Swiss-Prot record:
Its main location: membrane. CDD domains: PRTases_typeI. InterPro entries: PRibTrfase_dom, PRTase-like, Xanthine_Guanine_PRibTrfase. Pfam families: Pribosyltran. GMP binds at residues 69, 92-96, 134-135. It comes from Escherichia coli O1:K1 / APEC. Homotetramer. The lineage of its organism: Bacteria, Pseudomonadati, Pseudomonadota, Gammaproteobacteria, Enterobacterales. It catalyses: GMP + diphosphate = guanine + 5-phospho-alpha-D-ribose 1-diphosphate; XMP + diphosphate = xanthine + 5-phospho-alpha-D-ribose 1-diphosphate; IMP + diphosphate = hypoxanthine + 5-phospho-alpha-D-ribose 1-diphosphate. 5-phospho-alpha-D-ribose 1-diphosphate binds at residues 37-38, 69, 88-96. NCBIfam families: PRK09177.1 (NF006613). GO terms for molecular function: guanine phosphoribosyltransferase activity; hypoxanthine phosphoribosyltransferase activity; magnesium ion binding; xanthine phosphoribosyltransferase activity. This is Xanthine-guanine phosphoribosyltransferase. It is a peripheral membrane protein.
């Protein structure tokens, strides 16, 4: 990855609210399925904005086996996704998104960020990100003091 895109808590909340406004009226949704772990925080923000209390998770792990990347479903929400929003923070190459689509073919699948390779796999997203860009999410960063350049 050659570039970095830094996401602040404020930016994340603004993007989540933008997605929530597109999902109105909220009564059309039975609940939210957050993809662990990246979709947990966006899922909580959406649940708040839409007044949705039924929140579930799907937990997927990727691991290397004979130099191939495989996905393992650790936990899934029941059903085919009808009436549910499935949310993740990002769609990148589309590997996880393909698995989600297979598990929940009737769900409305959304992300905050989308890279070109995965973009066709989601129903909605907020921010376009170049494929070679690494996203630094606020939950992966700490706030630290940075001394002035002058040293004074």
């Amino acid at each position: 990855m050659s570039e970095k895109y830094i996401v602040t808590w404020d930016m994340l909340q603004i993007h989540a609210r933008k997605l929530a406004s597109r999902l109105m009226p909220s009564e059309q949704w039975k609940g939210i399925i957050a993809v662990s772990r990246g979709g947990l925080v966006p899922g909580a923000l959406l649940a708040r904005e839409l007044g949705i209390r039924h929140v579930d998770t799907v937990c997927i792990s990727s691991y290397d086996h004979d130099n191939q990347r495989e996905l393992k479903v650790l936990k899934r929400a029941e059903g085919d996704g009808e009436g549910f929003i499935v949310i993740d923070d990002l769609v990148d190459t589309g590997g996880t998104a393909v698995a989600i689509r297979e598990m929940y073919p009737k769900a409305h699948f959304i992300t905050i960020f989308a890279k070109p390779a995965g973009r066709p796999l989601v129903d909605d997203y907020v921010v376009d990100i170049p494929q070679n860009t690494w996203i630094e999410q606020p939950w992966d960063m700490g706030v630290v003091f940075v001394p002035p350049i002058s040293g004074r």
